Amino acid sequence: MQLRSALMTGVARRTIFEPALTLSPEVVAWINDIAASRGPFQSRVGDKPLSVSMEGLVWQHESSAIPMFDCVWDLGGETVVLSLSRPLVEALVSTVQSGLAFPTEPTASLILELALEPLIARLEDKTNRTLHLLRVGKAITLAPYVELEIVIGPVSGKGRLFLFSPLDGLVPFAFRALAELLAQLPRQPRELSPELPVIIAGEIGTLRASAALLRKASVGDALLPDISPFGRGQIALSVGQLWTRADLEGDHLVLRGPFRPQSRPLECAHMTEIESQLRPSDADLDDIEIVLVFECGRWPISLGELRSAGDGHVFELGRPIDGLVDIVANGRCIGRGDIVRIGDDLGIRLRGRLACND
């Protein structure tokens, strides 16, 4: 019996879908924090202003039209790879000596480390570890990486901070320290797209009823609302914790004020009174809940087949189950992602930004 159970367990495990990528819960928390939209880091390199902005996390490697150079750093025994575009490397070199030809190793490492010495000193002070540039060479490191927009004086370019490996364990100290430093930058929530769909509910009345009354209710019983603006030709429109009123004109609803915060709009019996003209704040809008649905596919089916489908019916997906997952909000696809393992559970890793915050 034990042998049979072991064999059955082995078969079951082989049939369970296993994502190509496994992330530990700690790594997921770190990724979500590092990829958050924040204000730029601002400082100076020599006599030139420096600005570094986080552009997001890139999972699928993208070739660069502009030559990139891997700058391999050692922070207290841990390796960190930061790739910079050639114009950025040249801009850093010019802060040490203008007109200097593009250097080769080991000169390149020495000059870049000298150019970044004030920033290096600040990082060493905050981490209590030594930071040293090991080498600079042609970019060969592959995704995933955090994409950076870097501006040095009049020169702008891309930077790539490559993630550690593996991603199913602990976050290395160097990257934890980086997240702590970035956490000091103010968050800047991305603007919501005006095309993001939300669901508005039209409410015609409310009724306070006891559980005993509901248990006794049967077919044919009539329920009389306590509050029913519908009898006055009005309907309450609600989305999340926001509401407004509208007049019913034929098969149209005409708004009679902006949406504003109120937890239970129909508990206010005086809907015809003059309402506050204050529009909802960003915080009010942020509280609106939007259900995200993760879809592995859609396919047409006839009503006849649907009626006859019973236990054991087989639907053909027409695509591999480990393909891209559609992220749907109120019927609209706003993004795509890959299935990944997070500890004992499955999650969805975004392939790009959601359409609602482009």
Curated annotation (Swiss-Prot):
Belongs to the FliN/MopA/SpaO family. SUPFAM superfamilies: Surface presentation of antigens (SPOA). Gene3D superfamilies: SpoA-like. It comes from the Bacteria. Keywords: Plasmid, Transport. One of its GO terms (cellular component) is bacterial-type flagellum basal body. It comes from Sinorhizobium fredii (strain NBRC 101917 / NGR234). One of its GO terms (molecular function) is cytoskeletal motor activity. Could be involved in the secretion of an unknown factor. This is Probable translocation protein Y4yK. GO terms for biological process: bacterial-type flagellum-dependent swarming motility; positive chemotaxis; protein secretion by the type III secretion system.
